[in-house]
């Protein structure tokens, strides 16, 4: 590889975009392996707890409010497959912070989560904390989520931007430094029509350096391949992008859901005059906010307890072409070189790709953010090794960074509830999950492991550099059922979920989750 586009600390300072270092808000504790597995297997379909009732009995009003919330908390969001996708849902609120921020250090209003955590851990906090929590919950319950203004969801706190004149290496280092996945790139200070730099752009740059793709600008091509600095403002033109959507902070969630549900990944939130960007709202941040506050809105329960099959999203009929309500399944063989996977991600304009074996069994997942593991010259051999090997390297690297083994789960079943799907998306910080055929009941009961390479997720076996070997540690039946994979039959994305919410909960009845992808065309330079 002719250039080095990461600093010496990039491997040690970055966590995977798909496996969080801190999943406290998503219900997946990382304090130790046992707790983490129990949380994933047993509590995955349950949103975070609300504040305990005794924190709200300062007045009769708070007591009454808490009683209703306690009722909804007791019922949880337990999976009830009898619920139909036609069941009505009416209100929702969004609130969360994210370790890996999508654009800039912009915080989606974190009052409720922060107050909840503080009041639960520290019983000696002041009355002001209790009042803040109570006021936040009361305000949330007083209006339908569709009418919540965007100004309530963002808080400007050092919005990180870069100038288009800096090099691609500097932009990448900024991503790593602030644990971001994208950055607004300004042509001049205060640019209101800027594009964003993300890992798709970094992937395009890598492929250009390796002469795997071509562009019409010979000067940029030569500079990339000769290791010369290339302005990030030029690189972002290589990757097809949607228009830079901007909404004033006075707009509501119904409007933004119609945009994000069509496949647009992020929207800029501006001041009322639309002269200054105040924050960025991304698909992933919106989903996490939704999940973290699900207990506050019992009317979401019917939808969350519906299965993917019932909602008719994500699951593909292998005998027919994808419809406007379904994402296309894109995969690669585990024995193919990693460079082929990165090229396919670039060509298909996707954020991750499924890795399968020759029987089409899911064996892993490669995200575009994983390109950060091959940006140094010393990592060049990985590009020509197999995808299966790369998955094992990623897991080993995460283990070293986090001080523990890491086993993310990137698959669900057609019968999985939307709640469980949301929980996994939040826990893995993924943009999509792979849908596999459920294991046969006989396999679950007998613990059949005749083909461990295909019946277990590589997240359990790939840490061994010999994938064909059977792992020495036999998981319990509970864990085995959770980590078992199967034949790849579909995919469920953030866009799919947001589009369902838009169609069922707003006036955006004709939202097409694939429209944004169709808008992204080739860019000539």
UniProtKB/Swiss-Prot annotation:
Q: Where is the composition biased (Low complexity)?
A: 1-34
Which Pfam families does its entry note?
Answer: CBS
GO terms for MF = protein serine/threonine phosphatase inhibitor activity
Q: Does the keyword Cytoplasm apply?
A: yes
Q: Where is region (Disordered) located?
A: 1-81, 438-475
The segment(s) forming the CBS domain are 154-215, 238-296, 323-382, 439-508
**GO BP terms, alphabetized:** cellular response to glucose starvation; regulation of mitotic metaphase/anaphase transition; septum digestion after cytokinesis
Q: Where in the cell is it found?
A: Cytoplasm; Nucleus
Designated name of the protein:
Protein SDS23
Species for this entry: Vanderwaltozyma polyspora (strain ATCC 22028 / DSM 70294 / BCRC 21397 / CBS 2163 / NBRC 10782 / NRRL Y-8283 / UCD 57-17) (Kluyveromyces polysporus)
> Which classification does the entry list for the species?
Eukaryota, Fungi, Dikarya, Ascomycota, Saccharomycotina
